[in-house]
C-alpha cells in the first residue's frame, strides 16, 4: 500500500514538473536552428524538396524532421569529426536535436511570431 502511495506521489510530481516546463515553440526555439543549419537548402529554388522558411511550410514536416535529425541524416555532413573541426560543419548539436524532437513530440506549436530571430 505504501509503495503504491509513494509511486503515485512520484508520478504526480513528475507530471507537475513537466507541466511547468516551458514549451518548445517554432519561432523561439526551432527557427533559429533552421536558419543556421537548414534554410540554405530548404528554400524555394534550392536542392531540398521542401521549404523551412515559414512555420506553415515547416509544420507538416515536424515528425520527419525529428526522425532525420535524430538519425543524423540531416543536415547532411559526411566528414568525420574524429579528424578535426571543419569550418562549414552544419552538424547539429545534441541539444539542437533534442529541441526539434521535443517540438515535434508536443504537436509542433508555433509560438509567438514576435519571438522569431
Located regions from the model:
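Bacterial N-terminal signal peptides
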Residues: 3-16
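Aromatic- and Gly/Pro-enriched helix-to-coil junctions and flexible linker segments
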Residues: 16-117
